[in-house]
């Protein structure tokens, strides 16, 4: 082999090694998230959700069944998928698969694990390992009674699937004046049977944004997860971040434009009104952005916290616990009227 061919083969070998390293780097989480994600959200196929990558850095399109997956390209967990990396010796890439599970029985019909179906025009359901999850196709909004509409109710409209709000034939007011904001339904909602002869499809909305950008606020949702299968409003305490800046917070940025999630430097007692938590906690808070973007909770859960309000009086309240936060440009608009209404109803004992 000539010297020229040897040099050419050597160059091609280095180029191939470089490309392999580049591809491998895109599969694993970087040591530090990029300072700014693409300004345009990823364009996903119809029915495919946009989710944070496995590194909680930037939004990506969730990978579907049979597609390749990695840390940077997570599978659609809302569809019950997981990334099977058993075929990769480096445990970096895999294929989105559905775990083997039990069949489901709904209204006398047997559905296979992973099978999707529509029991009626109002719900889109999926069988997942013996459990049925359904997503409402109709809007799950709630219209509260008010001066313009003291007795709102939903009625069926001929020729349409979804019911609509009405105040009755004698009402003159307009609809929607005191309606809660349109809630996004949870990715999956379960089906619980309160009676062997009645199918109750559970409907639960996502928690609303916290009523305060700093300090203790309130968050609400609507659910029918009860024995009566009736829609009721639930409220929890929430704190996105403390109003006072902790020492060292300004220096934690280290040149970055956004600090997504930060943990309290010391154990603190949670407080609301004249009540103080019995135990101390080290909660996570959402950080701040220096480029005008907003930083809000992305993944949360709810825990029961014991508070002491008066000597000898102990009560339990649901409290939001932040898992991760995300920075974005879709900042909440000014909705002071709704927040004041929420605070007023809570002070009346509706919490």
From Swiss-Prot:
Gene3D superfamilies: Complement Module, domain 1 (2.10.70.10), Thrombospondin type-1 (TSP1) repeat (2.20.100.10). Residues 1-21 form the signal peptide. InterPro entries: CCN (IPR050941), Cys_knot_C (IPR006207), Glyco_hormone_CN (IPR006208), Growth_fac_rcpt_cys_sf (IPR009030), IGFBP-like (IPR000867), IGFBP_CNN (IPR012395), Insulin_GF-bd_Cys-rich_CS (IPR017891), TSP1_CCN (IPR043973). Glycans are attached at residues 91, 274. May be palmitoylated on Cys-238, which is important for extracellular secretion. One of its GO terms (biological process) is angiogenesis. Widely expressed. Highly expressed in neurons of dorsal root ganglia and dorsal horn of the spinal cord (at protein level). Expressed in astrocytes (at protein level). In cartilage, dominantly expressed in the chondrocyte territorial matrix. This is CCN family member 3. Interacts with FBLN1. Interacts (via CTCK domain) with NOTCH1 (via the EGF-like repeat region). Interacts with GJA1/CX43. Interacts with ITGA5:ITGB1, ITGAV:ITGB3 and ITGAV:ITGB5. Interacts with ZDHHC22; the interaction may lead to CCN3 palmitoylation. Residues 102-168 form the VWFC domain. The keyword Secreted applies. PANTHER family: CCN FAMILY MEMBER 3, CONNECTIVE TISSUE GROWTH FACTOR-RELATED. Induction: During persistent inflammatory pain the expression levels are down-regulated. The lineage of its organism: Eukaryota, Metazoa, Chordata, Craniata, Vertebrata. Pfam families: Cys_knot, IGFBP, TSP1_CCN, VWC. Residues 25-99 form the IGFBP N-terminal domain. Its main location: secreted. Immediate-early protein playing a role in various cellular processes including proliferation, adhesion, migration, differentiation and survival. Acts by binding to integrins or membrane receptors such as NOTCH1. Essential regulator of hematopoietic stem and progenitor cell function. Inhibits myogenic differentiation through the activation of Notch-signaling pathway. Inhibits vascular smooth muscle cells proliferation by increasing expression of cell-cycle regulators such as CDKN2B or CDKN1A independently of TGFB1 signaling. Residues 199-244 form the TSP type-1 domain. It comes from Rattus norvegicus (Rat). Keywords: Cell junction, Cytoplasm, Disulfide bond, Gap junction, Glycoprotein, Growth factor, Hormone, Lipoprotein, Palmitate, Secreted, Signal. One of its GO terms (molecular function) is hormone activity. SUPFAM superfamilies: FnI-like domain (SSF57603), Growth factor receptor domain (SSF57184), TSP-1 type 1 repeat (SSF82895). Belongs to the CCN family. Residues 258-332 form the CTCK domain. A lipid is attached at residue 238 (S-palmitoyl cysteine). GO terms for cellular component: axon; cytoplasm; dendrite; extracellular matrix; extracellular region; extracellular space; gap junction; neuronal cell body. It is found in: Secreted; Cytoplasm; Cell junction, Gap junction.
